[in-house]
Amino acid sequence: MRQIELIELEPIQSDVVYTPDDVAKSIVDWLQPSGICLDPCFGDGAFYKHLPNGSDWCEIKKGKNFFSYEKKVDWIIGNPPYSIFEEWLRHSFEIADEVAYIIPTNKVFQRQVIMKMINEYGGIKGIIIYGSGSTVGFPFGFSVGTFHFSKGHKGPTSLKLGNT
């Protein structure tokens, strides 16, 4: 495993986007995770409270930095910081077999390096497209989706139009 230099990052205000509880619940219900699950960006606990018992969490504001988390898990589910999405996704792929994030859709498709990383990991097993972020209670209007990345997945990608 590669070494990650831990640095103190000042929170970027645009990275603090809390997921409404009903949206988090609908995502967890769609995925039906089992085994060891991790919410890597706890925030207000919207995802964590819907994960199976025994799940773990990280939250930099509470002293649990996701980049220092090295235990293997079956699932990672959450709403990651957008400004460091590439690094966040890379670390997620190193420790989990199934990863699902609600994120602006351009974060997945805008850079070839991210698409290559996804392809090397496996693939996108499913996507829920919500349309504008404001439809799920986010403070912005660009397109948002939940992406389910699966290690070793080379099959089709299911697409769902979501409205929670």
Segments from the language model and where they lie:
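Class I S-adenosyl-L-methionine-dependent methyltransferase catalytic core
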Residues: 1-164
